[in-house]
């Protein structure tokens, strides 16, 4: 059966001398793998539409296993991302997170829209750290491991200062700080943003200015939480961390 669907290229894997296996996140059919025959050839009509992060419409011959990609049409190439090594690192991490955090052939229009809006923002120059934070926070709910971000996990307090307890899965208020000696400190701004990221509609995001220290606090919480509960090992995470370290070094050189 032939199906036509909007999709985003999550990853490609070389298969034989000339073919590629392309993993797509589609709006209508969820995550699916397709064989793109001849896509490794530069003159192939499938080569251009099997580029990482590309958003397009795809005509697929479906089957019980791998489908076959018959043809496709690009809607947005996300070329700016692919031409920037730093943006590529961020986008690769986001797509691998969605790839590893979702099951095949289970439609989820919300996830599709989340990835599409995230890639668009990256492509248009929105702060990459903020985009990534939003995706990571929202993916916690998708994977069934959302922390408590609305109130203290112990007493239900909704106002005041909060830190984050990895052990207890969420915010703890200052009255309960003693219950977790290993809590991670959060400024009021970092706590507010973590809560906001869970509910925020990415399509409404404009330019955001967040202090480096606040970003560092949020990054620490998300890294520890994912390490503790997700069970995921993402190769792209290491690459992204290397790019972040390089960016800091380059920034330091510019300031000196």
UniProtKB/Swiss-Prot annotation:
GO terms for biological process: DNA recombination; double-strand break repair. Keywords: DNA damage, DNA recombination, DNA repair. One of its GO terms (cellular component) is bacterial nucleoid. It comes from the Bacteria. It holds the Pfam family RecO_C. Transmembrane segments: none annotated. InterPro entries: ARFGAP/RecO (IPR037278), DNA_rep/recomb_RecO_N (IPR022572), NA-bd_OB-fold (IPR012340), RecO (IPR003717), RecO_C (IPR042242). Belongs to the RecO family. NCBIfam families: reco. PANTHER family: DNA REPAIR PROTEIN RECO (PTHR33991:SF1). Involved in DNA repair and RecF pathway recombination. This is DNA repair protein RecO. It comes from Bacillus pumilus (strain SAFR-032). The gene is recO.
């Amino acid at each position: 059966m032939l199906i036509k669907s909007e999709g985003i290229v999550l990853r490609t894997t070389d298969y034989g001398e000339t073919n590629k296996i392309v993993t797509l996140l589609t709006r209508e059919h969820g995550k699916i793998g397709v064989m793109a025959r001849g896509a490794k050839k530069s003159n192939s009509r499938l080569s251009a539409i099997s580029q990482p992060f590309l958003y397009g419409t795809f005509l697929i011959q479906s089957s019980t296993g791998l489908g076959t990609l018959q043809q496709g049409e690009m809607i947005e190439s996300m070329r700016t991302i692919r031409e920037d090594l730093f943006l590529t690192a961020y986008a690769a991490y986001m797509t691998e997170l969605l790839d590893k955090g979702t099951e095949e052939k289970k439609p989820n229009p919300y996830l599709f829209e989340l990835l599409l809006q995230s890639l668009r923002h990256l492509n248009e120059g929105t702060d990459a750290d903020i985009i990534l934070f939003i995706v990571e926070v929202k993916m916690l709910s998708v994977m069934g491991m959302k922390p408590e971000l609305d109130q203290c996990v112990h007493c239900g307090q909704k106002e005041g200062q909060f830190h984050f307890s990895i052990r207890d899965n969420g915010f703890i208020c200052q009255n309960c700080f003693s219950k977790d000696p290993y809590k991670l400190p959060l400024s009021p701004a970092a706590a507010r943003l973590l809560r906001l990221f869970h509910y925020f509609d990415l399509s409404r995001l404009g330019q955001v200015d967040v202090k480096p220290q606040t970003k560092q606090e949020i990054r620490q919480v998300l890294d520890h939480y994912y390490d503790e509960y997700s069970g995921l090992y993402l190769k792209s995470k290491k690459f992204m961390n290397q790019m972040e370290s390089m960016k800091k070094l380059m920034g330091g050189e510019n300031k000196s």
